[in-house]
Amino acid sequence: MRILAISGSLRDASYNTALLRALREEAPEGVEVDIWQGLKVIPPYDQDEDLVPGPEAVEAFRELVRESDAVFFSTPEYNSSIPGALKNALDWGSRPVATNVFRNKPVAVISASAGAFGGVWAGAELRKVLGAMGARVTEAELAVGHAHEKFTEDGVIEDLDLRQGLSDALQTLVTSVLDRAAAA
């Protein structure tokens, strides 16, 4: 099973990207987690360019989503919402409507921020957007508050409860993929 992991952050030292690295370590046998960090190269959405094929970076992104069995998102919170670069990529992936690569795709959403609430509003907003796009949003939820305190200098998570929360979120997504395959 192939899961595409997308961080909503552009920062090199992103807590959300670090969470996805830890998630990859928690992956059970037979589950491959590929972290995509290409938000920076996706051009601003332009309906005039809303074609198939679209811009090269957009087509590469669409293909990654299309080839994955599921998508796992980890997002920071900016002004009580998701980062613009992430929303931009989602707009490209869901358009044109007839070729929406997220339709019926199982997805999971977690969030992390330096604040006490851990990006909970951004997580809720991302779930809403993904649902409106036709993705199959799982019940997996994890909001990591005070994220800057959760990692060692090497980016390792020592908090066993947090590691378990990541593992649980991943298992929820894996189960969703397996249930979808069994129903087909």
Enumerate the language-model features and the residues they cover.
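Helix-loop-strand module that forms the ligand-binding subsite of alpha/beta enzymes
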Residues: 53-133
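Glycine-rich phosphate/pyrophosphate-binding loop and the adjoining helix
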Residues: 4, 136-184
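Short beta-strand elements in bilobed, periplasmic/extracellular small-molecule ligand-binding domains
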Residues: 31-44, 137-145
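A general structural signal for well-ordered alpha-helical segments in protein cores
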Residues: 3, 16, 20, 58, ...
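N-terminal beta-loop-helix "entrance" segment that forms/cooperates
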Residues: 38-55, 150-154
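N-terminal beta1-alpha1 ligand-phosphate binding loop
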Residues: 1-31
